[in-house]
Amino acid sequence: MDESALLDLLECPVCLERLDASAKVLPCQHTFCKRCLLGIVSSRNELRCPECRTLVECGVDELPSNILLVRLLDGIKQRPRKAGVGGSAGNSTNVLRAQGSLTTNCGLNDAQNIHGGQQRIQARSPPVRGVPQLPCAKALYNYEGKEPGDLKFNKGDIIVLRRQVDENWYHGEINGIHGFFPTNFVQIIKPLPQPPPQCKALYDFEVKDKEADKDCLPFLKDDILTVIRRVDENWAEGMLGDKIGIFPISYVEFNSAAKQLIELDKPSGVDTGEGSSGTTHSSNSQKQADAKKNTKKRHSFTSLTMSNKSSQSVQNRHSMEISPPVLISSSNPTAAARISELTGLSCSAPSQVHISTTGLIVTPPPSSPVVSGPAFTFPPEVTYQAALGDLNPPLLPPPPLATPVITSTSSGAAAAVQRSISGPAEQVTHLRTSTRPSVFVAIYPYIPRKEDELELRKGEMFLVFERCQDGWFKGTSMHTSKIGVFPGNYVAPVTRALTTATPAKVAMATASSSNVVNLVTPTPPGAPCQKLQGNGAEFAKTVSTNGVPPAGIPGSHIQSSPQAKVLLHMSGQMTVNQARNAVRTAAAHSQDRPTAAVTPIQAQIPSASVLPQQAATSQQMPPPLSGPAAYINAAMNISRPSVPVASAASSSVSSAAFETECNWKSGSGLAACSFPENVSAPLNSAANKQDKDSKKEKKGLLKLLSGASTKRKPRSSPPHSPTQELEQTNSEAALEGAVGPDILPVNGNGRVASCTVDCDLVSASALVQDNRKPASLDTNVPIAPPPRQPCSSLGTVLNDSRPCERYRVVVSYPPQSEAELELKEGDIVFVHKKREDGWFKGTLQRNGKTGLFPGSFVENI
């Protein structure tokens, strides 16, 4: 074996310096340089083996030397120096390297350095025959340079390598001239030395009990640690200054060399992780494959290390030529900073930018502030205006399209079919559907509590990129372009159906498929009424002509210009509280932001005296508005068990009446309601016949309605923190006072009994005032947002209704994945579930986060 290669193997495992005769061997037979052992004793007041942690009872000076090492070094010194062909430059470099290693060598005093200096220079740095001493490459082709700063060379030139910009570009020197050149133009003769395995601290790691945690290595944020080895799945050993200890892997960010070291020492039982970590690994392999295909591209964030970040920031050698799709996941602060310049994100934590043919999707770090984001593009099969309308104010109604387009619904609902009835003939137009992009409308206002949260305003549109498992959404405001997170139960999905029509009236329909808000541009005033179909059943149906004039929209919600009116279709897995408070109609496009102006649905309870006869007398009232003006029925019948149901009387079909068909289903607190356009005229004999039938039906329905409040309770809201229970309880109590928790009972086949109630609007405002209780709320009371958790995967986690137990944290615990909680000593945790493997699921009282943690770190109180 060559002497230089042998000397490279004889290095201290702690400081990585070459060992000399002063090195000491411990009783466990591990050898270290004397300087490292003295540093350990001075910092910890005891000596433990850095490799196996065995306690050494004697002092450092009393330890024996490694006899085999001493003999090996003596043999190398006594060998004559070989005549090399490295050249004067290589020899001078060897002298400098030998002198540098001589001055920093472990355990040698000054007298030994001076006395044996020349011998060590000769022994340490003999030139190797045929191998150059500097990292260099040989030019395979001529390169003239394409940009200023490129290094020009001819075929056969030897180029000294200075640093590697990325996997496609080098920075080198030839004849005193520095510049950049592509990797595929040269052949690497001697590669650049690998950077030392290092890591950067992302958080502060403090040790409270120095006696119990004496093996831990405390550090502060942004400290640079030298990585020695991986201890187990969650801990690594490293050195900071003259201190050596273990530290949690999740607290640091490794460079490329340290990642390789950690992967080599990885235990066999450790998997790649779940959620986002698996995505990162797959994206890394995809990124490497794309990089091999595009060898002439100058953009790469993969090979940057912390050793060259200063020079990288000076030499801006990147261009944004990225072949879509590619996922850029940067662990280097400089690269993350360059990404953040393009996306407007903070570089305080690693960012991910996904660039594809359909747009730019930015995943900000959890701690990044809410800042302005980029513009977005959408799938080619859906027009821009059909997907979102105009992003920038002032908003105008979209122009008529030759082909009607609808951006469709949730996964559970069938494709919407819009029917236009012209006389006896019926023409059915099937509209194309698309599930992208995910556009949501805010149904509650929300004031942000943290810097990375978005402010929600009623009716404001949002584009959602990710749905976190804790119930929070990550997206951008379509008005301000700000990117952030917001509670998912404060918004509802939106689909927009555009027809070749001009503005008409506004109707309201609610169904029980999924939590969806459908914005529809209806037909012109002269056109026939529309019907919506879903799952084969007609949700909107024109039956009777016995109705009353609708309640008009308040002036604050009506557009001054004849803009396109919007039909608000809310359906879905909503809670009862949301069903009673969140149903609103969208008035038209706002002039300053894309909002849906809404009016709350008030709970109108008909009294026992409201019978079909009284409803018939109200038919003579003319409609208050006509023409293209917008109408809306602002009252929805939610019958109580003690109140008879007023049924409708059928009449001639000369003009349609307002009727509400409440089709209740299990798991849904909403009714499917539709309203024809006009009011009716006189009654006929068919109306009297239906009165008798409805009275019989009413008696049967009253039996079904009795006792419903004790059989069924409102569904709980999305996951919430125990500290927010008071707010939720107050909201539910107020809502029960307003409308009562009455939901129809379940039949034997599992469905809830359905009933048809008439929207008797004899005097809408008087009825609301008469039936309003002191505890009722006519405004929308938003439910509490779910507690924040790191965003890792799509979908939501349902709330656990089991009783909570209070636990106190006795030992701090750093989270090892995004699904785990960070525990600090003294924290209070509300435990929802105890798993068989010893892990608990609970909510942290300090910040309201819900996640998993080991049960051995807490105690019951």
Swiss-Prot record:
Zinc-finger ranges (RING-type) = 12-53
Indicate the enzyme's highest-level EC class: transferase
Q: Is Nucleus among the key words of this record?
A: no
Q: In which pathway does it act?
A: Protein modification; protein ubiquitination
Q: Give me the stretches of Polar residues compositional bias.
A: 301-317
Compositionally skewed regions (Basic and acidic residues) per UniProt: 689-700
- Any one Pfam family match given in the protein's UniProt record, by short name: zf-RING_UBOX
Question: Where, subcellularly, is it found?
Answer: Cytoplasm, Perinuclear region; Cell projection, Lamellipodium; Golgi apparatus, trans-Golgi network
Q: Which UniProt keywords apply?
A: Cell projection, Cytoplasm, Golgi apparatus, Metal-binding, Repeat, SH3 domain, Transferase, Ubl conjugation, Ubl conjugation pathway, Zinc, Zinc-finger
Q: Know anything about its domains from the record?
A: The RING finger domain is required for ubiquitin ligase activity and autoubiquitination.
- Record-given protein name: E3 ubiquitin-protein ligase SH3RF1
Q: Which organism is it from?
A: Xenopus tropicalis
Lineage, opening ranks: Eukaryota, Metazoa, Chordata, Craniata, Vertebrata
